[in-house]
């Protein structure tokens, strides 16, 4: 069976870490991420409550949520990312992580809240996005909140048609997802910059109405839509606060 296109993130993690970088994604020291999570936890009374993170990456949110007193469970399809996050979270007894395909693997337990940090936009086909969002919705207890943080966003010009495959998306965008490109990654240990060649990975941005329609079709209630300032993590993004 052909592996899913979003396994490109596993290949990227492997390449970046083998080049000597310690961190690719968010850091627990990201002030915007920390302050957003702190406010979200406090407003929803999530201390000592269970939170699942989809596409948890290297565990930055896990550290922050653990420090805020939450019971954390992170999942990601990348074994390399899970290895990194497990090491980062080893001193937090209420934090666990596991390899899981958030599109295909169902979540058996019900959680008090959920978070997705730059995860949804990794999915480009309509079917994968719908399957994942339904999975996330069904993992939540009634009236539980979910935060989609820094999802790729454009005010206009996004593709509103149906996308059925990664090949179809590549034709629509004209982007090259095969040729490695030079990227610079700041090493978390000593602050030096590591240069690495990695291909562009597929990502699908939506406008405000596109996101709202997508969430409401699953059953989520939209509480807040926030356009984020540009960051080194992603230039154009939005954070969407929803509730089951």
Spans of features found by a protein language model:
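Local beta-strand N-terminus motif with an aromatic residue
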Residues: 111-112
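A conserved beta-strand element that flanks and buttresses the S-adenosyl-L-methionine
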Residues: 115
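Conserved catalytic-core motifs of eukaryotic protein kinase domains, centered on the activation segment
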Residues: 125-127
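Short catalytic micro-motifs in class I SAM-dependent methyltransferases
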Residues: 118-122
């Amino acid at each position: 069976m052909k592996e899913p296109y979003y396994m490109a993130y596993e290949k990227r993690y492997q390449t970046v870490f083998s080049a000597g970088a310690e961190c690719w994604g968010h850091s627990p020291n990201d002030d915007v991420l920390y302050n957003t999570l702190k406010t979200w936890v406090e407003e929803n009374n999530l201390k000592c409550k269970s939170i699942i993170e989809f596409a948890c990456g290297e565990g930055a949110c896990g550290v922050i949520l653990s420090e805020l007193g939450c019971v954390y469970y992170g999942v990601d399809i990348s074994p390399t990312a899970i290895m990194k996050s497990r090491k980062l979270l080893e001193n937090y007894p209420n934090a666990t992580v596991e390899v899981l395909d958030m599109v295909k693997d169902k979540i058996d337990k019900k959680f008090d809240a959920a978070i997705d940090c730059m995860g949804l936009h990794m999915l480009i086909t309509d079917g994968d996005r719908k399957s994942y969002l339904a999975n996330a919705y069904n993992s939540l207890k009634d009236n539980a909140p979910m935060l989609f943080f820094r999802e790729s966003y454009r005010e206009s010009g996004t593709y509103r048609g149906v996308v059925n495959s990664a090949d179809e998306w590549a034709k629509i965008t004209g982007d090259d997802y095969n040729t490695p490109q030079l990227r610079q990654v700041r090493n978390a240990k000593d602050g030096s910059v590591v240069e690495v060649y990695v291909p562009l990975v597929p990502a699908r941005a939506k406008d405000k109405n596109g996101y709202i329609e997508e969430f409401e079709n699953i059953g989520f209630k939209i509480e807040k839509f926030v356009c984020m300032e540009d960051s080194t993590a992603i230039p154009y993004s939005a954070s969407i606060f929803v509730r089951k």
